[in-house]
Curated annotation (Swiss-Prot):
Pathway(s) it belongs to: Carbohydrate metabolism
Keywords linked to the UniProt accession: Carbohydrate metabolism, Metal-binding, NAD, Nucleotide-binding, Oxidoreductase, Zinc
Protein known as: D-apionate oxidoisomerase
Entry's EC annotation: 1.1.1.421
Residue ranges that the Swiss-Prot or TrEMBL entry lists as coiled coil: none
Upper classification of the organism: Bacteria, Pseudomonadati, Pseudomonadota, Gammaproteobacteria, Enterobacterales
Species this protein is from: Pectobacterium atrosepticum (strain SCRI 1043 / ATCC BAA-672) (Erwinia carotovora subsp. atroseptica)
Cofactor(s) required for function per UniProt: Zn(2+)
Length: 285
C-alpha cells in the first residue's frame, strides 16, 4: 500500500511557478511549508499570506519536496536538498530537462518525479470570464498535466497525482510518461515547434503591418480568426482546406521549413537542445 503524502515543502515558493502552485496548495488540506531564499521573493510569499519556513528544518519532515527553481539551478539545489530528505520521500521537479540530463542528485532510498502543466487547450470549452482569462492554467481553466514517476507503482502514481492535481488545479487528468517522453513533449513538441511557430506568426504579422502597410486592426482580425480555423481543420478535420489553400500551404513549407526538419526528433538533437537550455557542454550518461 502506497504511503499517504501529507506534508509538502515548496522550495522557490516566491518565484513565478512557486507563487502559482503555492496559491493552490494554500487552499488545500496538505501541510505545506514555503521556502524562499531571495529577500524580494520572500516579501511576495508573505504578502500572499503564507508563512516562510527554514528549508533545513522542514525538508527532513516532508513527504514531497517540490523544486520550483530554474532548470539551470536544479543540479546545485538538488545536491543540497536530496541528502536532507527522509527515506521514501518524493523529489518533484516541474520540468523534465534536468532529469533527462541526469543533473538531479541521486539517492537510492527516495523517489523522483516530474510533473509539467499542459496549459488549457485551445479547444477547451470555457464558460466563465475567469476561465477565458486563464490562459496559463492553474486558476480557473481546466488543464491536463504530463508527468513521469518511473519508479512508482500505479498506487504510488495515484497518490502523487492527487498532489499534482492540487498544485496545477483545476486538472482534467494526469498523463504518465517516461522522462524521455516528457522531454520530447517539452521542449521538442511544444517549444521547439509550437512556440517557435507562434513567434513566426507574430513576425509575419509585424511584417504585414510594418512593411506591407496593412492596417493593424485588419491584419490582426484576419490572422487571429485564421489561427482558429487552421487549428480546427488541421487537428479536428472540421472541414478540409480548399485546393487553393493547400497550394499556399505547400508553398509555405517549401520556403519556410527545412526539408530535414524532423531531425529534431533524433535523440542527439534532443540532447543538443536540452544541453543548450541548461547551459552545459553536453549531456552525459
Amino acid at each position: 500500500m502506497a504511503a499517504e503524502l501529507k506534508t509538502i515543502t515548496v522550495l522557490g515558493a516566491g518565484g513565478k511557478m512557486g507563487m502559482r502552485i503555492s496559491a493552490n496548495f494554500q487552499k488545500s488540506d496538505y501541510q505545506v511549508f514555503y521556502c524562499e531564499n531571495s529577500p524580494r521573493a520572500q516579501e511576495q510569499v508573505v504578502a500572499a499570506g503564507r508563512e516562510l519556513s527554514i528549508a533545513e528544518q522542514v525538508i527532513p519532515e516532508s513527504d514531497v519536496v517540490i523544486l520550483a527553481v530554474p532548470d539551470i539551478a536544479l543540479k546545485a539545489v538538488s545536491g543540497i536538498v536530496v541528502p536532507q530528505m527522509k527515506s521514501n520521500a518524493v523529489l518533484l521537479t516541474l520540468d523534465p530537462a534536468a532529469a533527462y540530463a541526469n543533473l538531479i542528485a541521486k539517492r537510492d532510498d527516495i523517489d523522483y518525479a516530474v510533473a509539467h502543466p499542459c496549459h488549457p487547450s485551445v479547444f477547451l470549452d470555457r464558460f466563465t470570464p475567469e476561465e477565458h482569462a486563464d490562459a496559463f492554467g492553474g486558476v480557473a481553466a481546466p488543464q491536463h498535466v504530463a508527468a513521469s514517476y518511473e519508479t512508482g507503482s500505479d498506487e504510488q502514481k495515484a497518490t502523487l497525482a492527487r498532489v499534482v492535481k492540487v498544485m496545477y488545479g483545476p486538472v482534467i487528468d494526469v498523463h504518465w510518461v517516461t522522462v524521455k517522453q516528457l522531454a520530447y513533449l517539452e521542449p521538442t513538441l511544444v517549444e521547439t515547434v509550437a512556440c517557435m511557430v507562434g513567434t513566426l506568426m507574430k513576425e509575419a504579422l509585424d511584417e504585414t503591418i510594418n512593411t506591407i502597410g496593412v492596417p493593424e486592426a485588419a491584419a490582426k482580425a484576419m490572422l487571429y480568426g485564421h489561427i482558429q480555423i487552421a487549428l480546427a481543420v488541421a487537428f479536428r478535420s472540421t472541414n478540409p482546406f480548399s485546393d487553393a489553400c493547400m497550394i499556399a500551404i505547400e508553398y509555405g513549407k517549401e520556403n519556410i521549413i527545412k526539408p530535414d526538419w524532423k531531425k529534431i526528433f533524433d535523440e542527439k538533437e534532443l540532447d543538443l537542445v536540452i544541453a543548450k537550455m541548461l547551459k552545459i557542454d553536453a549531456i552525459e550518461r
